[in-house]
A protein has these predicted regions:
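N-terminal helix initiation/capping motif
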Residues: 1-33, 43, 88-98
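Short beta-alpha junctions and helix-cap segments that line functional grooves
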Residues: 2-3, 52-53, 65-67
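Short conserved beta-strand and strand-loop elements enriched in small hydrophobics
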Residues: 14-19, 49-62
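Short, conserved beta-turn/loop elements at beta-strand boundaries and strand-helix junctions
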Residues: 21, 35, 72-77
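Conserved hydrophobic positions within beta-strands
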Residues: 30, 67-69
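Short, solvent-exposed secondary-structure boundary/capping segments
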Residues: 39-42, 75-83
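Beta-strand residues that line the small-molecule/cofactor-binding core
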Residues: 62-64, 71
Length: 98
């Protein structure tokens, strides 16, 4: 099967808070991240297409990342980032080049 990802991913272990639009925030753990999105390990079920805001601390900087759920399965969800600002882009870029 051919890899569809555009951006390289790095393995991480970052505590996150994920808040679905119109729903309650829940805790999860980001297990991999790229410039395009992240996989969040969680027991919560969030439907495909749900807009979310991910609160995470990267390199000592608190970030709120907008995104959309692109897939969900028992144990986690894949989130594609929305429009990121310069600060968010820089922080993720720094994480990817460690």
């Amino acid at each position: 099967m051919q890899e569809k990802r555009v951006h390289p991913r790095v393995q991480v272990d970052l505590a996150v808070s994920c808040e679905p639009k119109g729903g309650a925030a829940f805790a999860g753990v980001a297990k991999d991240v790229s410039m395009g999105g992240m996989f969040i390990e969680s027991t919560e079920v969030v439907p495909f297409g749900t807009q979310v805001t991910i609160a995470v601390r990267i390199s000592g900087v608190d970030l709120k990342l907008p995104g959309t759920v692109r897939w969900a399965k028992p144990g986690g969800l894949g989130v594609q980032f929305g429009l990121l600002g310069a600060r968010e882009t820089h922080s993720i870029s720094q994480l990817l080049t460690r």
